């Protein structure tokens, strides 16, 4: 093995450790939030700094659980309001009740499911059946 391979392996290991740490910090934030929201917010800040330092992507399930503006851990019904909207496109609106920041996430699950169903049925030779 050359130096590049060793360095690449080390980088991969560092990123794996960083991913584990981010996951651990967010699960800790989730567990500790009912007792100490400030500590949960601190865990989120640490997780964000680890993620930025290691240059890894934040998993989607955690990306939507903190406010992008004030970096507080969001719990629907406690410090976040979650609403579903259809116009101009179907999306989820999450409002941080600490700072008032609004985040919008599109949801296209039904269309993707229909597309998958249509592609599977055309492979079988049946064609799309939208009657059911």
From Swiss-Prot:
GO terms for biological process: tRNA 5'-leader removal. Zn(2+) binds at residues 67, 70, 96, 99. InterPro entries: RNP4 (IPR016432), Rpr2/Snm1/Rpp21 (IPR007175). It catalyses: Endonucleolytic cleavage of RNA, removing 5'-extranucleotides from tRNA precursor. Its main location: cytoplasm. Gene3D superfamilies: 6.20.50.20, Immunoglobulin FC, subunit C (1.20.5.420). It is found in: Cytoplasm. Signal peptide: none annotated. The keyword Zinc applies. Keywords: Cytoplasm, Endonuclease, Hydrolase, Metal-binding, Nuclease, tRNA processing, Zinc. Consists of a catalytic RNA component and at least 4-5 protein subunits. Part of ribonuclease P, a protein complex that generates mature tRNA molecules by cleaving their 5'-ends. Belongs to the eukaryotic/archaeal RNase P protein component 4 family. This is Ribonuclease P protein component 4. It comes from Thermococcus kodakarensis (strain ATCC BAA-918 / JCM 12380 / KOD1).
């Amino acid at each position: 093995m050359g130096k590049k391979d060793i360095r690449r392996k080390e980088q991969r290991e560092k990123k794996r450790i960083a991913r584990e740490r981010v996951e651990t910090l967010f699960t800790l934030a989730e567990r500790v939030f009912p007792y100490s929201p400030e500590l949960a917010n601190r865990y989120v800040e640490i997780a964000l700094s680890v993620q930025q330092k290691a240059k890894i992507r934040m998993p989607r399930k955690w990306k939507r659980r903190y406010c992008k503006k004030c970096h507080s851990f969001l719990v629907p019904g406690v410090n976040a309001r979650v609403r579903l909207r259809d116009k101009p496109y179907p999306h989820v609106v999450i409002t941080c009740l600490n700072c008032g920041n609004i985040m919008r996430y599109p949801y296209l699950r039904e269309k993707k499911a229909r597309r998958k169903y249509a592609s599977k049925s055309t492979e079988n030779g049946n064609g799309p059946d939208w009657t059911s």
